[in-house]
């Protein structure tokens, strides 16, 4: 090490002494954590060989932007160029990086890559292939890329004519070739500035202001800023994971932090997932609605702000790595020598395509096993095998289908992963329970948390996964080479370095050993943001690591759904008590300004929540670490990791944690490193959960190669859908989020589950659902009734609640039991159609669940702000009840060229289209309608399990449009074989008084077709024939419904089927 000059020694020692004075008063677990940061700063200063340091200015108005240097290097698929600072460094929140490289690559006709990175490549970038593969930055190396002539999108910049144009620094913008409309524009002159911060954000200090006083591009070692102009009232969707009052982001006032956090489901904050992707819908200059997607590839914490006319990115690391997706479909798939003609001749642009193009880039979602679309049941608080078995038995006794039983952390011995409690879940009884489930064609899923208990250091305790992890050297470390220790449910814990050489081997061994004692069908991955209950390293030099007491959760829960007053009506949650309705009376504003009959106000007496995330302490009990450092940079290689100068709004509205522990709260310390001393956790924190999912997916493929892995996980990053499904986290037994400031005291309710499902279609994770009836707080009968109905028409269906809350299994209330039977039976009946949508979306990347305007852009203005209704696939319109004490709802039904049909009664909906209308919605019902011109493939006899249901013959429900036509394709496979999966496509079409079907592919359908229901048959046929033979039928004049029965038709035909195999001739009477 270069020696310190005498002149600089005194101030450096004084700074160190001051730091030690403040830290030595703290436990060793905190001061070691902080001392490492300050020593690192001193070391970097010394290496610079100078006493001169750089202090942040906290002022972006001084930032000069960049200028183009030299001539771009052109190639067939794009170009590269060099950028350098256009003036004196501003060092706003770090050290300005003087030299940057611009890479512009036309990767595909619809996909444009723009990457601005430090030429020295010192900034962290996601290694290619770590989660998903992607083209590189050098256009000369691109294989099978597109060209500027072929591209849907045009890249412009202010120096493209050889000289800098306009005022300010270098900037770029992206335009559509077909219309000339600009979709991304970084020119500061086109972007409004805001000198005041957002009114909704209480803290607007120099370190985290939400003001936007300037828009020059900033590229520093710990702060990157870039802005783009937006139209007034921009229609932005995505940028999550988030909970707010609308699927559409507020274009005038949105602050969205990005940093994976164990936080429940907070309103207007960051939470479990990290997805800096948005889809935007705009009216072009020609008045047409077009949609595109914009993705920023990064791993660092960041804030994204929306204010009127602008979107601004603020990242605390990484690079500016954008991809733009046009949302356009080419006129044909054939190649053309005239690429320009091909690009202009686009025939369609759609949100489905804009989302699909992004999902194709990060990797299409996995096809999940068929059984996973059954009903799942869980709660935190099934304390032993007997309680769990009693619930399984009660479900069957009440004839409520149960496909998958889950256990939360209750089954673990002292909350240690890969163990079972010998008293409460003894292996013999536990194995017998699971075996009985398997014998009945049911399934079992246990939870696994990310934190691994520290291997005991005494001779009386053994924890093999911890010991084996030490042997294979897979656990995250401190900078000094010691193991990093956190605290979670088991006490002292390690965390796996997911990129360690032996990480995959360790996970596979642990999962394989666990599978020999617990015969699970899938795994539930939790706490993998990752979550830790301490700030910093929990173990100091003298900590006794054998003392690992497990945490004890509280057991009392207060809080009820809006309008239910437990002080008046008790804790039953019933709709009626002694003949009286239990909702208190009182007017509350609806979304449309009208008054509803019963109050949505909540009595908040003793509103104490039991959460999976407990209060966070500093190591050994201290709450917070030292105050902010006096930021002094020696050079751009030095960083302040736990407490960078720009404080992203991590956990905003959740707690009043001081900014100096902003990033370390509730997670692994940012200074922790990989097993090789590389990869500061600051850079890889947001990847951790998805890398764990990848390890689990690969392990399950290895352990059970003939089965599809099934994972449900909490923390996600782009590409996670290739490995896992997701549930929307620890939500609340609420109808919707609470009003005003009250919203920040709780979180997502039932209404937000729709927003969440739609979000994750954009994020490429299609198996998605919420905790039905709510996780936090006590639920009640009416909320649970409505939620079970809604949950049956979302991809992932699981009822789950917290320890200490009243029980909410479907059999607990008679009306909920009845609603559950109705909803689950219908789900199982139409499961071939739902599964087809999920499988086809996995193959194509298009969303399985869609906002109405995705399919019907003519209703965009009416539906762009809300998600009160949604489409499952392109054919099932779901309109749930999302408020209490109503028997009617307002809903909008697009004009689809025929009659929408209720899938329960087959009755035609007779309403005015493209307007909000009133429809009946009695308790224990839900409005689900089949689109005209579409077909449902069904199981004819829904049963208790998915397996039993699938043994029954197929049926078809054909809803003719006004032209007497219908068409749909269905995906058939065995529901279990991993990809590449032998499958077939069944195509059903109707027209000219006939219904025809054809099947193509490798998979042979296991069941015959037994009935066909044709809707909108206005006259009674004289005969119905199939294959030249008359068939049985009945006709309902009121419903205009033809029911053809007794078919027993082989969908496969003889051998490999080609052509038409089913034909029903409808010879109608005059």
Swiss-Prot record:
Designated name of the protein: Alpha-glucosidase
The UniProt entry's GO biological process terms, in alphabetical order, are: carbohydrate metabolic process
Glycoprotein recorded as keyword: yes
Which molecular function terms from Gene Ontology are attached? alpha-1,4-glucosidase activity; carbohydrate binding
Q: Which family does it belong to?
A: Belongs to the glycosyl hydrolase 31 family.
Does the record bear Hydrolase in its keywords? Answer: yes
Q: What's its catalytic activity?
A: Hydrolysis of terminal, non-reducing (1->4)-linked alpha-D-glucose residues with release of alpha-D-glucose
Mind telling me which InterPro entries this protein's record contains?
Gal_mutarotase_sf_dom, Glyco_hydro_31_AS, Glyco_hydro_31_C, Glyco_hydro_31_CS, Glyco_hydro_31_TIM, Glyco_hydro_b, Glycoside_hydrolase_SF
Signal peptide stretch: 1-35
Please list the residues that make up the active site: 526 (nucleophile), 529, 730 (proton donor)
Q: Which organism is it from?
A: Candida tsukubaensis (Yeast)
Q: Which domain of life is it from?
A: Eukaryota
Q: Which Pfam families match?
A: Glyco_hydro_31_2nd, Glyco_hydro_31_3rd
What's its EC? 3.2.1.20
Keywords recorded for this protein, A-Z: Glycoprotein, Glycosidase, Hydrolase, Signal, Zymogen
Q: Which residues are glycosylated?
A: 48, 99, 144, 161, 208, 384, 458, 480, 513, 544, 566, 574, 578, 635, 818, 885, 916, 983, 992, 996, 1008, 1029, 1043, 1052
What is its EC class?
hydrolase
Quote the function comment for this protein.
Hydrolyzes a broad range of alpha-D-linked glucopyranosides, including maltose (alpha-1,4), sucrose (alpha-1,2), isomaltose (alpha-1,6) and turanose (alpha-1,3).
